């Protein structure tokens, strides 16, 4: 019994230490969230965003990914962000608050994109977790399916897509759908992603539909 308690305690300590490290690092670098390190690491490996690009950031609040994206896209680039939660303004980011699952919010987002094709779609969306896998997983998969639908509507030929997906029911089918739409798909687990989390990031390049 004591062994089990000790294991749980050690695991909890590791998690807290891990979180504390990235939270402190985010504060030091002026990032709004530790999630900024995830897109930084993906960018370092996959070079998704370049100066002058147009980027859509779904599930953007509190703004960690948008901070990184706007810096990479530069003055001639464009970052359009959306979240159901409010987000403090970021210079160079066009933010729309609303529920991406609603048609009117999607329409408003498409209006902001305009006629220009998008180079990169980012999605760090996740549902409010209930702790019940049978409820949470379908909700999470619905969001990533909407993000892929967004790619089909706005992404330029050879465009890129980075999306957070939770491993579980529906993951394999979703991976297949992404592979059908892009030339290359890689699975990333950034160092800043919590070790025990089921989240992974699919990084897809070369949009071909």
From Swiss-Prot:
InterPro entries linked: RNA_methyltr_RlmE, RNA_MeTrfase_FtsJ_dom, rRNA-MeTfrase_E, SAM-dependent_MTases_sf
Keywords for this protein: Cytoplasm, Methyltransferase, rRNA processing, S-adenosyl-L-methionine, Transferase
Catalytic site: 164 (proton acceptor)
EC top class named in words: transferase
EC number: 2.1.1.166
Classification via PANTHER family: RIBOSOMAL RNA METHYLTRANSFERASE, RRNA METHYLTRANSFERASE 2, MITOCHONDRIAL
The name this protein goes by in its record: Ribosomal RNA large subunit methyltransferase E
Organism: Shewanella piezotolerans (strain WP3 / JCM 13877)
Lineage: Bacteria, Pseudomonadati, Pseudomonadota, Gammaproteobacteria, Alteromonadales
